[in-house]
Amino acid sequence: NISFVFVNPEKDMQRLLQKGLTPSRLTVKKKGVVSESVIVPWATIQYQNKIENISLLKESSQTTSQEEQLLNSIQNLEFSFIDGLKKIVFPKKKSIAVLTGNGELDDLQLYSFLKDLGRHYHLGKFTLDSVSTAPQKTLNQLDNYDLALVAKPSIAFSEQEKFVLDQYLLQGGKTLWLLDHVVAEMDSMSQKGSSLAFSRNLNLDDFFFRYGIRVNHNMVKDLYAAKISLATGNTGNRTNYENFLWYYHPLVTPSNRHPVSINLGSIKLQFPSAIDTLANAIQKTILLESSSLTKVVETPNFIELKAVNELPDPKIFRQGKKTLGILLEGNFTSAYKDRVPPFEFSDKRETGLPSKMILISD
């Protein structure tokens, strides 16, 4: 049996805050009069000894109006409740290997992402360091995981490491790649006012090419972009800040072509690279795509913060939609087929079992 309890938040706001059910402000316009109301858009599911809080108000981008946010939240209600029920009713069954050793993001940088994943899956750190001395053992250990997460590596992969990941994929393991193919960081730009954006060599171009995609070493600028906050002067001893559109940070609306990306709000990407698709037997589904108002910037190239003051010329933002996130599905052909592999496996494959790969170029 399912029991429903509706609570007036005004009667016990302090207790709700202690549970993490934070209120939101809603602007209401009635008969020309604008007022502000405080709402607590949350639901709590309790099952056996477990409790799951469900946010009913979807997060929005800077360019999303309140009306659009509310409409998106209403459309997302069914998904929110189903997701909450799955978290609390079904036990964790699958596991994710969080790869380290190639300069990936550290735990602090991945904290929010991994915290959310940890509600659904078992997580474990995994390094490919031992692949040069014990490749078969490394692959066997990696095969214990259902998915390998590679988050922003900055050190090139060796052929031995690539071969292990290749065979892992062909044996049915799934992979999620979050790749920065261009070195361009806002921190150094904020200090100096400019920065040299240059290509990052991860030794993966041939790897992905054999699977049917090419991640370019460029940056996609988009007129549909997020804003960055910059200091514009001082008032007394107080620094003034102002928000500026920053076309190197596209605001991407995920496609509804696959359940992975359906009903997601706008996603901010930073200095993403365009992904090209190549003809082969692998099924490809675009998950993240820019608007049609884009300009591709090749690398190496200087990026200057003063560009925020320049009005964009629509005539040069005409390079069309660019793929920034993609899902590959099917029976992959080994990236080492018809090549001499760095070592031999007892169960080496050239054609794989059905598997999946997601690549996001940020």
Give the residues covered by each predicted segment.
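Acidic, S/T/G-rich, low-cysteine, solvent-exposed domains in lumenal/extracellular/periplasmic regions
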Residues: F79, F90, D106-D362
